[in-house]
Amino acid sequence: QAVLYPSIYSILSKSKVRVQELEPVEGAAVPADTKKAEIKEKEHEVITHGLPVPYSSVVQPIVSSVVVNPGVIPAVVPVDAPTPADTKKAEISDNAVVAYHAAISPLSVVSHPVVSPLVHVPQVVYV
């Protein structure tokens, strides 16, 4: 698979997604072997890029999924554990990977260059 560099393509659209992230609390009074963290809601930008396609007289369906800009973040992982009825138990996992995938859709034949959307969707993958 080839790696696509989104910065070389034109931007078709932008949108915002809200996610909850854990942030450590510095200087919190907690026992020595524990860490205190707060869950904070943040906005991330989702960008759709345009992929220019040269003139073509042949039908060339292009379907691909390419990982772009992977990064490692701590994530809250749900845990099946006995808890009181109105509570949920979760653990912090340091090995969750957020991978942005660029999906290239099939293209139809036209007599002029077309633009195919590349949509970057954050996905959490546990390793």
UniProtKB/Swiss-Prot annotation:
Q: Which UniProt keywords apply?
A: Cuticle, Pyrrolidone carboxylic acid, Repeat
The Gene Ontology terms for molecular function here are: pseudouridylate synthase activity; structural constituent of cuticle
sequence repeat placement: 31-39, 84-92
Positions of post-translational Pyrrolidone carboxylic acid modification: Q1
Protein name according to UniProt: Cuticle protein 4
